[in-house]
UniProtKB/Swiss-Prot annotation:
Organism: Streptomyces olivaceus
Protein's GO biological process: antibiotic biosynthetic process
Enzyme class: transferase
GO molecular function: hexosyltransferase activity; UDP-glycosyltransferase activity
The name this protein goes by in its record: Elloramycin glycosyltransferase ElmGT
């Protein structure tokens, strides 16, 4: 089977789908990814990728869209999104930019199925045009609320009726934790964290168990520090200075000069796979990104979430409502201490980790997709 993955050019949208794409490859299926910007890093996962948007990043794409619809982001800041449908206008813009490259890739490569990241309608249009199944892959706790249909309708205003036609078959893979959401959409899939790879020193923070002293991981994800600067972490020097914990700051190579001199027990890490560091930590403080949220849940680590953008507040609320962490506008020492000292948070986080391990693994879902498509289910027979 050949699977063409059409992905919104954002790590947070594409990286959650990497384990399923690996599972398909391990079965002997062929995979080709069409995306752009930072999401081209998926090539580091051993997956072939087509650069559909040469020279573009998510920041430049958002900037270009803002020029055409300046009121959209203003309205979004005033009234945060509640479902993915709220992002339909910008998702339609991104789909429009990806559509022709995705069409060309499909014409040349002739896939048997399309995998699209959540709300990425370019994949849906191509699946409909070729009469092949669409698999839409979720990336967190945000619910669809008809986002795919809304985005296709906006595309149809430019493409004509063909743009609104649905694929012949559609499957949705939901990586949200069942106990932390109102209802699972489609097929449940275990969230297996993928944050890239790294060469790790045996003596470093990423190998081994938790140290005797509490260790707190601090991260602002893949976008926030680069788009908003170190000001997103302005709280850190003061909180760390008066706290007993050791702090690991996963900065991803961002410019931190505006933070000034950091206390000696704050260690700055470059790009670091969170899944390798989190098991050594007693807590994580972050912005509410889906990838970080799910990685912490998989590791059973309590979270202090200060939501920043887009769906961040949805993830923060899911964590807080489950008792696996706390939500705060600005992290402070008192709240962090409460998170570390109250055992109920760690207990709830471990319960969620156990729940995640009970969900269908990517290999299981890959086999189910073969069955759904009427293809052989024995590994290697596809």
């Amino acid at each position: 089977m050949r699977v063409l993955a059409v992905a919104t050019p954002a790590l947070g949208h594409l990286f959650p789908a990497v384990p399923l794409l690996w599972a398909l490859r391990a079965r002997g299926d062929e995979v080709l990814v069409v995306t752009g910007g930072d999401a081209l890093r998926v090539a580091e996962a051993g997956l072939p990728v087509v650069d559909a948007l040469p020279g573009e990043t998510l920041t430049t794409l958002f900037g270009a869209y803002q020029e055409t619809d300046p009121a959209f982001f203003v309205a979004l800041r005033r009234s945060p999104m509640t479902t993915l449908r709220d992002l339909a206008p910008v998702l339609a813009y991104l789909a429009g930019r990806l559509l022709e490259p995705a069409r060309r890739a499909a014409e040349r490569w002739r896939p048997d199925a399309i995998l699209a990241t959540h709300g990425q309608a370019a994949g849906a249009v191509v699946a409909a045009e070729h009469g092949i199944p669409l698999v839409e892959h979720g990336f967190g706790f945000v619910r669809s609320d008809g986002a795919q249909e809304a985005v296709r309708q906006l595309l149809a205003e430019r493409l004509g009726p063909a743009g609104s036609e649905p694929p012949p078959e559609r499957y949705f893979l939901d990586i949200a934790v069942p106990s932390m959401t109102s209802a699972i959409e489609g097929m449940s899939l275990r969230a297996v964290p993928y944050n890239g790879g790294a060469v790790l020193p045996l003596s470093g923070a990423s190998v081994g168990g938790r140290p005797p002293r509490p260790r707190v991981l601090v991260t602002a994800g893949t976008q926030l520090l680069h788009t908003h600067g170190a000001g997103a972490l302005a709280w850190l020097p003061e909180v760390a200075a008066g706290h007993e914990a050791e702090f690991l700051l996963a900065a991803g190579g961002a410019d931190l000069r505006d933070l000034g001199r950091l206390p000696p027990h704050v260690r700055v890490l470059d790009w670091t796979p969170l899944a390798t560091v989190l098991p050594t930590c007693s807590a994580v403080v972050h912005h509410g990104g889906s990838g970080t949220t799910l990685a912490a849940l998989a590791a059973g680590v309590p979270q202090l979430v200060s939501p920043a953008l887009a769906d961040n507040h949805i993830n923060a609320r899911a964590v807080a409502d489950r008792g696996a962490g706390l939500e705060t506008a600005v992290p402070d020492a008192t709240t962090l201490t409460a998170l570390l000292r109250e055992p109920a948070f760690a207990k709830a986080a471990r319960e969620v980790a156990d729940e995640l391990r009970s969900l269908p693994a990517p290999a299981d879902v890959a086999a189910r997709l073969h069955t759904a498509f009427g293809l052989p289910t024995t590994q290697g027979d596809a």
